[in-house]
A protein has these predicted regions:
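Short capping/connector residues at structural and topological boundaries
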Residues: 18-22, 92, 141, 166, ...
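Short runs of predominantly hydrophobic/aromatic residues within well-ordered alpha helices
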Residues: 24, 114, 152, 168-175, ...
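A residue-level signal for conserved active-site and pocket-lining positions in enzyme catalytic cores
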Residues: 28, 118, 156, 202, ...
Length: 310
């Protein structure tokens, strides 16, 4: 094991950002799309009863820190270790709940303040784009400068982050390097991280020597759970892909069978048309030779009307 613990774990993430206000303020200002006059200056952590209720699975795989600043804006910071398709909807739901909770029954709506949900995702979920940073908010479809300032959702795909490609937003790069480069195998932190006061403080908090045996057991338990979840997710993914492949083969076989049926039907129609034409030719010759209509109908199977029309 190295010198530090991994900052993405439940224990460490909450210790760094859930117990040190200056560090979560720095993180929020670095990662959220805030203008200079919107920067976070001070925060208070949410009381325990205000934090969204979690299922056991969510408790084990989602790490969150929730707070409110001096302007009464709400902030929900989450680390999602394993991606699920329902995650974005759950983020929207929890942010909406935080927004609604600001208003008492019959309250004044113009006092409502925006809610920011900052979500770090440890897996790539938007596979068709290269960007690691995704910002969602309420904007006019045509006039994008027209905004409803209510919910702001940010998703950061950690595995897509490449620090060498960014020259601006220094603190954003430093915090993302902190979250992606520091693991429990790290023997020495990069100099750029140690030189920054906030990140250096966060690194100090991650040093293994600062944790009790009980905390280390909780840390190991967290990663054991994440490992099991990844194994289960990979197994499910493989089974889904296998099922999709089998369905594709079955669909192809059905398509071939349908094509053969259509071909057989077409051949049957052609044969039927040939027989019909043969009967018509026979009827025409019989009619020319003066056979009675009734006799022609009996021999060819044509109707009286069809024979009279020849």
């Amino acid at each position: 094991m190295g010198k530090y613990l991994d900052p993405r774990a439940d224990l460490t993430f909450k210790k760094v950002f859930g117990e040190h206000k200056n560090l979560v303020i720095s993180l929020l200002n670095a990662l959220l799309p805030l203008k200079d006059d919107e920067r976070v200056e001070s925060i208070e952590y949410w009381p325990a009863e205000k934090i969204p209720k979690r299922t056991q699975v969510e408790k084990d795989s989602i790490v969150d820190v929730c707070c409110k600043d001096n302007k009464n804006r709400e902030f929900i910071v989450e680390m999602q270790m394993t991606w699920t398709e329902s995650f974005k909807k759950r983020v929207l739901l929890n942010a909406s709940k935080a927004y609604v909770a600001q208003s008492e029954a019959g309250g004044v709506y113009d006092t409502l303040q925006p809610v920011y949900a900052l979500n770090f995702v440890n897996e790539n979920f938007m596979k068709d784009v290269d960007d690691y940073y995704h910002y969602y908010h309420l904007v006019h479809d045509k006039y994008t400068d027209k905004v409803i300032d209510g919910l702001h959702l940010v998703f950061v795909e950690l595995k897509k982050f490449k620090p060498q490609t960014f020259t601006e937003k220094k603190m954003q790069v430093l915090w993302l390097r902190f979250l992606t480069e520091i693991t429990d195998k790290t023997l020495e932190a990069p100099a750029e991280l140690l030189e920054n006061p906030e990140v250096s403080e966060a690194l100090k908090i991650l040093e293994i020597g600062a944790y009790s045996p009980g905390e280390m057991r909780a840390y190991d338990k967290f990663w054991d759970y994440i490992s099991r979840q990844r194994t289960i997710a990979n197994d499910i993914r493989r089974e889904v892909e296998k099922a999709k492949a089998e369905i594709a083969v079955a669909k192809a076989e059905i398509a071939v069978a349908n094509a053969k049926v259509e071909e057989a039907n077409a051949e049957a129609e052609k044969a039927k048309a040939k027989l019909k034409q043969k009967d018509i030719d026979t009827a025409r010759r019989m009619k020319a030779k003066g056979y009675a209509i009734a006799d022609i109908a009996e021999i060819t199977g044509l109707t009286v009307e069809e024979i009279e029309g020849l």
